[in-house]
Amino acid sequence: MNRKEFIKTAAFITGAAATGSYASASATVMQKKPLGRVALKKSLGLGMIKEELSLADKFKLARELGFDGVELNSPADFTLTELLKAKQAAGIELPTVVNKDHWSSPLSDPDPAVRKKCIESVAKSLQEVKDLGGDTVLVVPGVVSEKVSYEQAYLTSQNAIRELIPYAEKTGMQIALENVWNNFLLSPVEAKRFIDEINHPLVGWYFDIGNVLRYGWPEHWIRTLNSRIMKLHLKEYSRELMNTKGLWEGFKVDLLKGDNNWPVVMKAVSEINHQGGWLTAEVSGGDRNHLKQISTQMDEIISYLY
């Protein structure tokens, strides 16, 4: 089913209050958002909160420090009841989850049993994020290695993602593929084509701003991927540290101190009228003071929107 057919079908079943796998698809996800000023709420990964606190108190701390949401790994290590209770007590949102099995059991693996494990895990994540009141699951699309060729990963992962579409349609949740250091989909033009070939409104990109600085410029990716970007991850990166100390050392730089040209990056976010609603920090965590600093830095970055 292509985008046009899916949207027509969703409109019909919503009006008819039909039951079945399509009935719960989220109409708001599929509707084209009106033009207007881009607005982003702040979120951070739960693992970044290093204070020795209960789940509820970690959520409360995040809220006190100016964060509107928390991103969880999924399937979660907590029960749904625990998560919802802590969410309500803190008055915080849980808009996105990161599937935790896509590296160990990648969607590009040549073994069908391995792919099945990941598909089942992502299906659980789609239901989980819906139950939590969110709308998006982050998924790594695949991994290229010495034993898995680029072309093989491309075709295999696309087919696996297509197998996930019925679960996305049933829940109305989005599958957002993240650009990571997986030796795969290394240009924005290719990343755009990958999504367009899948051709479904509930499959797009979870764009990581810092991950591309190793070999590109995030503003280029943002303009090319455009409306295919569902959510944004926030990272900083230093090419100087990369060149002098090693690839992974490039991430060891504070927000606003690396090579992201934040006014230019956020101008691109504004230009595409990004309506994903969230900017989620994925940087080194720490105590209350460190997290407050991150929150303040994010405020400055968001201020460059227009």
Give residue spans per PLM region:
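A structural motif
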Residues: 67, 129, 134, 229, ...
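Active-site beta-loop-alpha junctions enriched in small/polar residues
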Residues: 47-49, 73-75, 99-102, 142-144, ...
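Active-site acidic/histidine proton-transfer and metal-coordination neighborhood
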Residues: 10-18, 32-36, 108-204, 263, ...
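Glycine-rich, proline-tolerant flexible connector loops at the mouths of alpha/beta enzymes
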Residues: 72-88, 141-148
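Conserved beta-strand positions in the central sheet of alpha/beta enzyme cores
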Residues: 71, 96, 138, 230-233, ...
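Short amphipathic alpha-helices and their capping/turn segments at secondary-structure boundaries
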Residues: 77-91, 121-131, 217-230, 267-268
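Histidine-acidic metal/acid-base catalytic patches
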Residues: 2-43, 48, 52-63, 188-204, ...
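Catalytic domains of carbohydrate-active enzymes, especially glycoside hydrolases
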Residues: 56-76
